[in-house]
UniProtKB/Swiss-Prot annotation:
Fluoride-specific ion channel. Important for reducing fluoride concentration in the cell, thus reducing its toxicity. It comes from Rhodococcus jostii (strain RHA1). Coiled coil: none annotated. Signal peptide: none annotated. Belongs to the fluoride channel Fluc/FEX (TC 1.A.43) family. One of its GO terms (cellular component) is plasma membrane. It is a multi-pass membrane protein. The lineage of its organism: Bacteria, Bacillati, Actinomycetota, Actinomycetes, Mycobacteriales. This is Fluoride-specific ion channel FluC 1.
Amino acid sequence: MCAVSLTKPVAVVALGGALGASARFLLAELWPGIWTVLLINVVGSLLLGYLAETVGPDRLSRLFLGVGVLGGFTTFSTFAVDAVREDAVTATLYVVATLIPALLAARLGMLAGHRHRLARKAVA
C-alpha cells in the first residue's frame, strides 16, 4: 500500500483515537483509580463486540470506530501497569475482575450485535 492510500485511513484512526483517548482521560480524571480503568476496558469490550457484528464492510468506519475510538478508549497497557503496582491480592483480584467481565462483555456485545443485524435483515 502506498503512502497516498494510507493518508485517509491514518487520519480516520487518529481522529477516532483522539476522541476515544479524550473520553478515557475525562473519565479517569473524574474517577481516578484502577476500577475506572476496569470499567473502561469492560465497556470498551462490550462496544467492540457489538461493533464487530454490526458495522458493515466499510473499512473507514471500522478503522474509525474500532481501531480509533475504541482503541483509544480502552487501555491494556494501563491495566497491566496498574496491576503490577498493586499488592499481590489486589492485583490478582483486579486481573480476574477485568479479564472475565471483559471477555463476557465482548461476547454479550457480539450476541447483541448479531441479533441487531438479523433484525435489520428481517425488516429489509
